[in-house]
Amino acid sequence: HLEHRRQRQMCIRDRDMHAYHGKDERRIPPLILGHEVSGQIINGKLKDQISVLNPLITCRNCEYCKSGREHLCPDRVLLGMNRPYERQGAFAELITVPDHNIFKVPEKLDVKEAAVAEPTAVSYHAVLLAVEASKKPLNECRTLVQGGGAIGLLCALILSKIQGNTNLTISDPNQKRLNACSKYVDAKTVSPDHKDIKESSFDLVFDTVGLEVSRQQAISVVKPGGIIAVSYTHLR
């Protein structure tokens, strides 16, 4: 295991806020939160390097790990979580993780940007699954991203900047979130009840909200044979 020096940058996500307010059954006090971090390594192969880490620690020996599905490992542990197993999070002054969970940050990438690697990976994975499942190129799909939070915005950026999707809509009831999205991505930003969000009107829907109401709307507005990519589940 390697020690990770006191982080330079940390992200505070909605999961952390849920836990802070006692609404996350997998994160119960007393617990140090935090799983999105960039910082400097104290010792090991990457000593003194600015790095990001994968907060998911797995056994690497089960059938799921060996088939590239580490997220299904029965012995998986996530930083900043105590269910099913406790592991203190990255807000601690020092943390230890296996060396294979640490990745050197390219010199051209700012350490603040590097801290967003984990949610970016979540969003990119969702887009790649949609690419694999879709019967038409993503740049030809009429696409709806439900939710203008971190995952929704990152999905929209990847769809627009990498996949070349120009027929993109982001929906969110919070106008401030929509305004923020408009600063970074060329997309139509609307409320979830906007008249343009019609039944069977989208080739591709990304549900980054994870509520029953968003799931039902996704099912309603996707075209027959279309794709719904779910990248978030809401904890009650």
Segments and roles (model prediction):
Residues N61-Q146:
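NAD(P)H dinucleotide-binding glycine-rich loop of Rossmann-like/cofactor-binding domains
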Residues L109-D193:
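Mid-domain Rossmann-like dinucleotide-binding core that forms the NAD(H)/NADP(H) cofactor-binding site
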Residues H1-R8, I12, H234:
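Single conserved hydrophobic/aromatic residue that forms the stacking wall/gate
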Residues R5-Q9, D24-K66, P106-K108:
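Glycine-rich beta-strand-centered segment in the early N-terminal region that forms part
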Residues D14-Q40, V52-N54, C73-Q88:
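N-terminal glycine-rich cofactor-binding segment
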Residues N54, L94, A115, L144-G148, ...:
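Glycine- and other small-residue-rich loops at beta-strand/loop junctions that grip anionic moieties
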Residues A133-L144, I162-Q163, L178-N179, K183-R236:
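Glycine-rich cofactor phosphate-binding loops and adjacent beta1-alpha1 units
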